[in-house]
Amino acid sequence: MEASYESESESESEAGPGTQRPGTGTVSAAVREHLRKLCLREFPCGAGSWNKSRFLPQTWRTWRELVPREEDVVSPGEETVEALLGLVRSRHSPWALLNNSNAEDSFLRELAIRNPLTITDTFFYSYFRSLRVIDKKVTLVDKDLLKFLKLEELVLSANRIKEVDATNLPPTLKVLELYGNEISSMECLCAHPPAGLQHLGLGHNKLLGPLESLYVTANHWPNLVSLDLGFNDLTDLQSMVTSLRTLRHLRLLVLQGNPLALVPYYRGLTIDSLAQLCVLDDITVSPNEKHLFRGLSLNGDLLAQEAQFVVTIGNIRGVLDTSVLDPEPRPEGPFITYNYYVTYDFVKDEEGEMNESAGVLAEIVKPSPSLELLVEESPEEVVEDVIEDIVEEVTEEVEGSLESEVEESGESELSVISGPSTILQMPRASAEELAKLRLRIDPRLCPSPGTVLFSTAHKPWAEVIPCSYEMQHSLRDLVPLKAFLLAGTTVTIVEEKILSWPVVLPAVDSPLSAKKGKGEKDKKGKEKDRTGKGEKEPAKEWKVLKKKKEPPKELRQDPPILQVLGRGLVILEPLLAGEPLVSTVCNFGVVRTLTSDRLTLARDSKKIKKVAKKEKPKAVIPIYEGDYHPEPLTVEVQIQLNQCRSAEEALRMFAV
């Protein structure tokens, strides 16, 4: 028989059935409180005026009077047993059981109606074989549990127990479930554990470190058949399986959710080390698995304890083509380019990834210097220095700000091509520059504490932008990795807008008078050359003017303007729960508009006509508002946890 208890708030009323009530927060107090709520000694249960004639002393009656007569079966003002049972069985009765009650509660109430004199403390202590105290804010396993002489199962899930005094556990106990508590070490359970315990459940507690493997040996649990240590912070797989090997009766084991279960060879090493194991992490161990990982435990100490993840980012769809909304560039600029990329955060690694990720972070948040010259560079090339270099560059610019004003002296040949020269304004102070920099950094592009930001390559706009990104993360610090997987990773689609301006290099070393004389001399020389060449010079000048609208080769770039187009969380907890792959399409909603798509269609149709002049141009299908269904902004994300499929693969990839 058993009694189950669901989550309810405790009451301050007097407890029953005993005369004394233990302190709140103990197991026995929770049991007594539940029994009190069953009202086993109150109407319609128990003995009272409603059934007293059935329990009057019978010694003074003659033997003829002991035979019940029809009219004397129920005295006036009393209820029959059937009527009382109907009151507790009917759902509409005010004495009906609560919704979260079970069959055991119903049995006890009916017993209290049929034979209320049996409801005593002695009865309860000998009656219960199973106690379930779930989510009752219990903090202490008290010694009153020893009064339950036949107790075999004790379930204390979802409470606040930090330590368990094993001396207070009944020696008859076979099942002890402590799932979802706050136990930080198994040492407290090993003082005087029940010798006949067959199942121990410690899932979702706070077990931490490699020393916990010392407390899962046959010296403490000689008859253990089932062990649940899932979702703790256990780290040393080799030590754990070495200790578990001593449990000869162990058949069911749960270790998933621990950092040690993230290593690629976890399942193979555990299966090969525990030959008698039947079920691991709720998955039956097959003979084929035993064959594939045979011999792996002999080389377990040679395997590196690290987890490997592969992050793949596919296509971006539904991006708004912002360039069609910008005006045509003028000769003096600015020339605007747009790039798009995806960022995600991942937990820090000790060695390899730190150098690369620092460059990625600087690429995202650091503006290019105001005087940097980019000679025929593609828009995808960006600055790769770390953020700390900004302060040094700003200091150098401030020192050179005294020479920032340069007088113009005539028009040069470069001004004919690129338009009027622009005087570059230096920053006035480093504080102002840093203040501007802070404004340019979107807080959504900064990684959360303990993580590093990674980015795909910067790509120009297209209907479908292929990222073709794949990154392998190898991590040795497994405890922070578990915390990261529980939190998930944030995926962001970023639009980068870069404004480029033509650069005019003024001659600083020549005085004004010398420039003027030189200008007249050059003018005369040009006229002489033009006379010798005849009418060829005007044609050349016309070609130069014709190329006036082309962007110059030497440009300076403004700091990139970043805009977050979409941002969302990718849940990674399934990887911790045993799933090898998380694959999703992040949907950030529709960002395109009918106007922008019409402009994009018109621009693309012009390009097609220019390329295929000789061919018959294809008819452009117009976009009507009624049929307009824009594609939402999406990106394909896949994160895979590497897992070894055989002992040979594990030794080849992870042997030190």
Curated annotation (Swiss-Prot):
Domain (LRRCT) ranges? 258-296
- What Pfam families does this protein map onto? LRR_8 (PF13855)
Compositional bias segments (type: Basic and acidic residues):
517-544
Q: What domain of life does the UniProt record list for this protein's source?
A: Eukaryota
Specify where the region named Disordered lies, as residue ranges.
Answer: 1-25, 512-554
- Residue ranges of the LRR repeats are 150-170, 172-193, 196-215, 223-244
The protein's matches in InterPro entries, at most eight in alphabetical order, are given as: Cilia_flagella_integrity, Leu-rich_rpt, LRR_dom_sf
UniProt biased composition (Acidic residues): 1-13
List, alphabetically, the SUPFAM superfamilies matched: L domain-like
Keywords, in A-Z order: Leucine-rich repeat, Repeat
Q: Which PANTHER family does the protein's record reference? A: LEUCINE-RICH REPEAT-CONTAINING PROTEIN 43, PROTEIN PHOSPHATASE 1 REGULATORY SUBUNIT SDS22-RELATED
Know the name of this protein?
Leucine-rich repeat-containing protein 43
The organism named in the record is Homo sapiens
